[in-house]
Design a protein with these regions (language model features):
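Helix-to-loop junction immediately C-terminal to a conserved catalytic motif
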Residues: 49
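Conserved ABC transporter NBD signature motif
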Residues: 57-65
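Conserved ABC ATPase "signature" region
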Residues: 64-65, 105, 112-130
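ABC ATPase NBD coupling module
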Residues: 66-82, 108-111, 115
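Short coil-to-helix segment of the ABC ATPase nucleotide-binding domain corresponding to the Q-loop/switch region
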Residues: 93-103
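Conserved ABC ATPase signature
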Residues: 134-142
Length: 142
């Protein structure tokens, strides 16, 4: 069983990923989590497996209030929960721009053409404003 009671998650800097989320999944029940990029899907999953902690509210998994789980108890809780995340295959020491540019550079495109193509691709997927960020600063769906 998984239950969220008025759960919020706010990151350093004030960015709020979740705001007062409440739901319950019974034992054996299946659910699909969908939403736009930055909606908080990955954050919600990270709370369930204790990769992160809620800023407010309660997360209950199999009857255990995760707010009360010590660092030493985290592995035992995780052994009873399975989560599959998206696999990005990104280089974390390079910016979003550099990650998109790398195969074009390897393929021999001119720097001007690389820039044109990278910016067109980022624009198409709504990430133009994120080109100078590193992958760790992106939400799971970005």
């Amino acid at each position: 069983m998984i239950r969220f009671d008025e759960v919020s998650k706010r990151y350093a800097g004030g960015s709020e990923a979740l705001s007062r989320v409440s739901f319950e999944l019974a034992d054996g029940e299946m659910s699909f989590l969908t939403g736009h990029s930055g909606a908080g899907k990955s954050t919600l999953m990270k709370l369930i497996i204790l990769m992160e902690r809620a800023s407010q509210g309660q997360v209950i998994v199999n009857g255990t209030n995760l707010n009360r789980v010590s660092r030493r108890q985290v592995p035992a809780v995780r052994r009873n929960v399975g989560v599959v995340f998206q696999n990005h295959q990104l280089l974390f020491d390079r910016t979003v721009y550099d990650n998109v540019a790398l195969p074009l550079t390897i393929a021999g495109f001119s720097p001007k053409e690389v820039g044109r193509r990278v910016r067109a691709a980022l624009s198409k997927v709504g990430l133009s404003d994120k080109e100078k960020r590193y992958p760790v600063a992106l939400s799971g769906g970005e």
